[in-house]
Amino acid sequence: MKLLVVIDMQNDFIDGSLGSDAAKAIVPNVVKKIEEASKDTVIIFTKDTHFSDYDCTLEGKLLPVKHCLYNSDGWCINDAVRSAWIKDGIIEVNDAEFREDNTIIKTTFGSTQLMNFLAREGHNFKEIEFCGLCTDICVVSNVLMARAALPDMRITGDSSFCAGTTPEAHNAALTVMRSCQINVI
């Protein structure tokens, strides 16, 4: 069995307050990845989630751009990505209420909930693949946490299924992943 972890494919990171052309460009790739996932692939999404106190958090002070505010349009998974998931019968139609076992709500870059899940259930998977946004922030954070939880697991990150805050930051994150024995393609 394989695990596909789709990191933060949310509106605010694609065409919202922190969106970019690079993020928009990977949407069709991520959609295709979900649609082509085999029946023995478990798909988990993460959703970056902030609240009205965002400005008071360290992230809010260092990145003063409100994004992914709980239950806002920017917080929702991109429609095309969501539709690929729904079409496969994996989730309920209501975006705000993804099935708990397939979505991880996280309030920071890396998810300890994902890491704990991997430490507990990782032995059930032959491989873990990551895709999503942003390569140099949330993707690399979660990939490295997965490596810590599962030091002997084959973990893959496909560079065409991720986008960074800049091309340079994207490439730097891929270099870090390779250094930590992540299969980067």
Regions picked out by a protein language model, each given a short descriptive name:
Residues 1-103, 126, 152-156, 165-179, ...:
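Active-site acidic carboxylates
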Residues 103-141, 163-185:
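Conserved N-terminal glycine/acidic-rich loop preference
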Residues 143, 147-148:
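Surface-exposed amphipathic alpha-helices with a cationic face
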